[in-house]
Structure formats: structure tokens, C-alpha cells
From Swiss-Prot:
InterPro entries reported in the protein's UniProt record: Ribosome_recyc_fac, Ribosome_recyc_fac_dom, RRF_sf
Swiss-Prot/TrEMBL keywords: Cytoplasm, Protein biosynthesis
Organism (species): Psychrobacter sp. (strain PRwf-1)
Entry protein name: Ribosome-recycling factor
Function: Responsible for the release of ribosomes from messenger RNA at the termination of protein biosynthesis. May increase the efficiency of translation by recycling ribosomes from one round of translation to another.
Gene3D superfamilies: 3.30.1360.40, Ribosome-recycling factor (1.10.132.20)
Lineage: superkingdom: Bacteria
Gene designation: frr
Annotated PANTHER family: MITOCHONDRIAL RIBOSOME RECYCLING FACTOR PSEUDO 1, RIBOSOME RECYCLING FACTOR
A Pfam entry, by short name: RRF
GO cellular component: cytosol
Length: 184
């Protein structure tokens, strides 16, 4: 029972880390990476479709993304979707779409850093909520006399260690992201 609670909690914590990594991939760093365009939706025959389903997105060089629509007729629609995605990007269109990454100003870097810190804090809160749920489940088992007080204390210590591990992971990911943001 205790192991099930810990495993379930740890799975939820892993999902929180995945969400954080996904959020960090969308934070603009001045360097080109395909994840930046993952939230772009293209109007494809009247339906909003994710960009990666109508075009391939590749890194041409460190500051340029190359977007190649699968259908030539989609070039204008993809270009329009990227412009309207509110990412501050200005694609150049020919047969393929080149998306140059504008250099980040100091102010933009600070804003992106604040955004990254906010995402990290949300993840920490989520991890702590999972810890609280796990501890409540353990206390419930102890209250119903299904586990001893020693087992409860041991499980609580284990849960705290798991929580500390994931919080440290969030902190290291944030530190790496901030370092990446401040590189010129």
C-alpha cells in the first residue's frame, strides 16, 4: 500500500517535470529550436491543425528555423500562422519558410527569465501538492490502523526525500534555462 502511494506520487511528480520541460522549450532564448513553434496552429482546410502536422520544422543554423510545408499551397497559411502566433518572429517566405530568431534585448531576456521562474515555481507548487496528497494518504492508512506509526514515519521521510529530489531537479533545470537565456 505504501509503495503504491509512493509510486503513484512519483509518477505524478515526473509528469510535472515533463510539463516544466515542455514549458521551458517554448521560452525563447535567441537560439533556434523546433519546440518554439510547437504551439502554432495553422488553418488547414478550415480546421486548426498543429504546425508539425502540416510542415516539417528543422534547425537550419543556430539562429534560423526552416519550415517546409508538406503541400506547396500551405506556404502562405503557415507563414500567416507563425506571424500571428505572438512569438515575435518574422518569417521569410519563398518555396520554404525561413524563420530568423531576432537577437534578444536585455529587457526581453529579463522577461523570459521571469517567465521561466514563474513556470518553475508553478512546478514546485505542484510537486508540493503531490507530497501533501501522499502524506494525507499515509496518515489515512495510519489512522485506520493499516500501518504502524513507525511505517508512517518512515514513509513520510521517504516521501520528503522524493520531493526534495524533484524540487532539486526543477531548480537545476531553471538554473540551466537562466544560464541559456543570459548567454549573448
Amino acid at each position: 500500500m505504501i509503495n503504491d502511494i509512493k509510486k503513484d506520487g512519483e509518477d505524478r511528480m515526473k509528469k510535472t517535470l515533463e510539463v516544466l520541460e515542455n514549458a521551458f522549450s517554448k521560452v525563447r532564448t535567441g537560439r533556434a529550436h523546433p519546440g518554439m513553434l510547437s504551439g502554432v496552429m495553422v488553418s488547414y482546410y478550415g480546421a486548426d491543425t498543429p504546425l508539425n502536422q502540416v510542415a516539417s520544422v528543422n534547425v537550419e543554423d543556430s539562429r534560423t528555423l526552416l519550415v517546409q510545408p508538406f503541400e506547396r499551397s500551405m506556404v502562405q497559411a503557415v507563414d500567416k500562422a507563425i506571424r500571428e502566433a505572438d512569438l515575435g518572429l518574422n518569417p521569410m517566405t519563398a518555396d520554404v519558410i525561413r524563420v530568423p530568431m531576432p537577437a534578444l534585448t536585455e529587457e526581453t531576456r529579463r522577461d523570459m527569465q521571469k517567465l521561466a521562474r514563474g513556470e518553475a515555481e508553478n512546478s514546485r507548487v505542484s510537486i508540493r501538492n503531490v507530497r501533501r496528497d501522499m502524506l494525507n494518504d499515509i496518515k489515512e492508512l495510519a489512522k485506520e490502523k493499516e500501518i504502524s506509526e513507525d511505517d508512517e514515519r518512515r514513509a513520510s521521510d521517504d516521501i520528503q526525500k522524493i520531493t526534495d529530489k524533484y524540487i532539486a531537479s526543477i531548480d537545476s533545470k531553471l538554473e540551466a534555462k537562466e544560464k541559456e537565456l543570459m548567454e549573448v
